[in-house]
């Protein structure tokens, strides 16, 4: 379960809801307060932190996180400026086996998994690819939009939240590119996009949205996604492809 920990007002109740409903892992995209870590650990819930910079990973480990997700700028959603290929090994080096490091950002198949393992990560975290599955929860048109996008159809915009966020380019992102001086800090801009009817984050398939303005996070790997695949089949194919890549690489010695 992922929450915006930079919006702390509802955090205790939200974390308690995760615990009460059997959540086993809490993932934070914008930092993890120490009291949240302690509450999760007291209830046998693992805590992971999305980290876009080396110093973020250092802070996450110091706060007691069980897992660090090294997320490159290619990722959909809130993201930084350092690419996955450069970020992952630097975070692996600084974490020094204190906790597992997982790679994220622009990864969509077994080749990405094999590459992440070669960089020292112990696994991968894929977001966009798993939105394009029948099981994923999302607003109408979101999955279809992902299937139609090319690798350069995303943009890093502050228009939806006030923070840098990689999303599907549309009329709303274009407006804020042209009116950047009017963007408010988080969470005011987040609230504004909701009030504008452009942000239905977390809403389901029965929600009415305007596809030309809607908040649809997407990573740069989106251009490789051309069909909806059941999540279980997708996991199996990713692992099989990674194994094939690793086997092929072993013949190059």
Task: Locate the predicted segments by residue.
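Active-site entrance/lid segments in N-terminal catalytic domains of soluble metabolic enzymes
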Residues: 1-100, 205
């Amino acid at each position: 379960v992922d929450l915006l920990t930079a919006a702390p007002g509802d955090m205790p109740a939200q974390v308690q809801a995760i615990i009460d409903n059997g959540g086993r892992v809490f993932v934070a995209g914008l930092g993890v307060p120490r009291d949240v870590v302690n509450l999760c650990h007291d209830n046998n819930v693992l805590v992971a932190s999305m980290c876009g910079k080396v110093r973020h990973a250092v802070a996450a480990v110091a706060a007691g996180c069980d897992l660090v997700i090294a997320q490159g700028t290619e990722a959909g959603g809130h993201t930084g400026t350092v690419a996955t290929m450069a970020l992952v090994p630097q975070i692996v080096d600084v974490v020094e086996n204190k906790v597992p490091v997982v790679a994220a950002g622009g990864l969509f198949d077994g080749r990405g998994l094999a590459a992440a393992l070669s960089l020292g990560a112990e696994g991968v975290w894929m977001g966009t690819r798993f939105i394009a599955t029948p099981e994923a929860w999302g607003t109408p048109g979101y999955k279809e939009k992902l299937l139609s996008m090319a690798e350069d159809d995303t943009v890093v915009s502050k228009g939806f939240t006030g923070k840098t966020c990689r999303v599907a380019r549309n009329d709303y992102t274009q407006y804020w590119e042209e009116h950047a001086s009017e963007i408010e800090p988080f969470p005011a801009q987040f609230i504004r996009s909701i009030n504008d009817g452009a942000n239905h984050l977390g809403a389901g398939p029965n929600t009415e949205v305007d596809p030309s303005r809607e908040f649809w996070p997407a990573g740069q790997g989106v251009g490789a996604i051309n069909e909806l695949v059941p999540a279980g089949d997708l996991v199996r194919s990713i692992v099989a492809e990674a194994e094939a890549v690793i086997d092929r690489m072993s013949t190059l010695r």
